[in-house]
Swiss-Prot record:
Pfam family of the protein (one): His_Phos_1
Catalytic function, reaction form: (2R)-2-phosphoglycerate = (2R)-3-phosphoglycerate
Name of the protein described by the UniProt record: 2,3-bisphosphoglycerate-dependent phosphoglycerate mutase
Associated pathway: Carbohydrate degradation; glycolysis; pyruvate from D-glyceraldehyde 3-phosphate: step 3/5
Superkingdom of the organism of origin: Bacteria
Sequence positions that bind substrate: 8-15, 21-22, 60, 87-90, 98, 114-115, 183-184
Function: Catalyzes the interconversion of 2-phosphoglycerate and 3-phosphoglycerate.
Annotated EC: 5.4.2.11
Length: 228
């Protein structure tokens, strides 16, 4: 039976500081390391044999993957990384304190940017964009693929092709797959898997460092889901 494990990275240093993070590359906090370690322990305690793992290009997700596989004694399995699993790009909000953003733009506007399905935050500057384009992780990408900012809908548009072309292929082969990613890239996968409405998906809360297991049919229909 195919099994999918979705796990948002452990708390990051910027999560702890209440900052918009998006594509900014920050480390796990001490709490985040503990969460990721505990996630791996839960995988081991539940005797789950992972066949393959997928993660983003951002350190907090990469490190979470490492801790999960290390603590579950499965460091040797293949791990595939893609920018398509990165967090939603928060554009010009990245690096801002969320409370300060509410004071500057108004609480209602910030809520719309954070929780609407198809509204993008303000775009990043050209200088910020050029820094991403120069990053070795992204400098091979067509510039047209690099976002200035993203809505949740935009995030889904880039995540689902990766699901279809890569992740789902291992599940269709009956394997157990770990996806260690981010709040919004995981929301995109949940929306697709469960056919969640645009209105409802924005209210889904994704816990940090908590493995969410999906048991699937051979056709990848959801049979059951539960947190470890």
């Amino acid at each position: 039976m195919p099994k999918l494990i979705l796990c948002r990275h452990g708390q990051s240093e910027w999560n702890a500081k209440n900052l918009f993070t998006g594509w900014e590359d920050v480390n796990l906090s001490e709490q985040g390391i503990n969460e990721a370690t505990r996630a791996g322990e839960k995988v081991r305690e539940n005797n789950i044999d992972i066949d393959v793992a997928f993660t983003s290009l951002l350190t907090r997700a990469l490190d979470t993957t490492h801790y999960i596989l290390t603590e579950s004694k499965q460091q040797w399995i293949p791990v595939y990384k893609s920018w398509r699993l990165n967090e939603r790009h928060y554009g010009g909000l990245q690096g801002l304190n969320k409370d300060d953003a509410r004071k500057e733009f108004g609480e209602e506007q910030v809520h719309i940017w954070r929780r609407s399905y198809d509204v993008k935050p303000p775009a990043e500057t050209e200088e910020q964009r050029e820094a991403y384009l120069a990053d070795r992780r992204y400098n091979h990408l067509d510039k047209r693929m690099m976002p200035y900012s993203e809505s949740l809908k935009d995030t889904l548009v880039r995540v689902i092709p990766f699901w279809t072309d890569h992740i789902s292929q291992y599940l269709l082969d009956g394997q157990t797959v770990l996806v260690s990613a981010h709040g919004n890239s995981i929301r995109a996968l949940i929306k697709y898997l469960e056919d969640v409405s645009d209105e409802d998906i924005i209210n889904y809360e994704i816990k940090t460092g908590a493995p969410l297991v999906y048991e699937l049919t051979d056709d990848l229909e959801v049979i059951d889901k539960y947190y470890l």
